[in-house]
Amino acid sequence: MSAGSHESVTVARTPSPRRDAAIGGIGGLAGGLLGVGGGFVLVPLQVLWAHRDQHRAIGTSLTAILPIAIVAAATYYFGSSAPQADLPVAFFLALGGVFGALLGALASRRISDRALKVLVAILLVGAGLKELFDALVGTAPHLVGAAVPMFGPKDYALIAAGGLVIGVVSGLTGVGGGILVVPLLVLGFGVGQRIAQGTSLIAILPTAAIGALTHQRSGNVDLRAASWMAAGGVPAALLGSALALWLPARALGGLFGVFLLVAATRMWPTREQARPNLGTNG
């Protein structure tokens, strides 16, 4: 084997429950605090720290995300005097998102995702700067009020369509749906920051479950590692979501704005990357 081919092979490190639990803890804290599930953190940490290949890291991440997102979503919904999540909105987002992710995954072999990644990165920068500006000014509706606007059938149809588009983008590019759901609800529909994050956590569950099953059937899941990641991620997600309920809305919006800018830098294509089937769900 030549030196060049040797360098292209990813060799997994010796399994370490402590390392996987730490990875899960970091992802769970970020996912609970920001309402995005945690895949945005779990996947790169597995690749860099545990030396798992990209596909296996994504499949393992999706499996670990399920209990992490469930606990975080339950905290948003039950951990406050009023539920910080909207179930009808989550349902229509998930309905569109599941079909969109499947369509995106099917089309991913025939469509180049480079231009789409550039477009998504630009949108994330715009949304991140808007969140930061709103946090500094402090008068934006989603940071002042906590209520969900009164939605009618047309609004729910638009929300489902938004979920469909997000699902397609997720399936084509691998960007987690939660990263896009929160800005859609906050900036597109005027939903409060906290409620948008709690709703996002509920909405990504069906897509994460389908993605986890798909990767498991393909042999891209390390169940032992996923279990340890969930063990570290669940209590951290509980802490992160509790912090989200405690922080002022302006601070939470500012944090999410910074997160979107960081996500945009990761989204910008710098080289040919392997695409996951159903995204990483945040």
Residue ranges and their predicted role:
Residues 43-44, 67, 182-183, 206, ...:
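Proline-centered helix-kink/hinge sites
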Residues 58-62, 193-201:
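Small-residue hotspots at the loop-to-helix junctions and early N-terminal turns
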Residues 35-45, 172-184:
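Transmembrane helix boundary and interhelical junction motifs in multipass membrane proteins
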Residues 63-72, 107, 202-209, 235-236:
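Membrane-embedded alpha-helical segments of transport systems
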Residues 1-29, 48-49, 54-56, 74-168, ...:
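Juxtamembrane transmembrane-helix boundary motif
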Residues 40-41, 63-64, 179-180, 202-203, ...:
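Hydrophobic alpha-helical transmembrane segments of integral membrane proteins
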Residues 211-215:
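Membrane-helix boundary/interface segments in integral membrane proteins
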Residues 26-30, 40-41, 45, 210:
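N-terminal signal-anchor/start-transfer transmembrane helix
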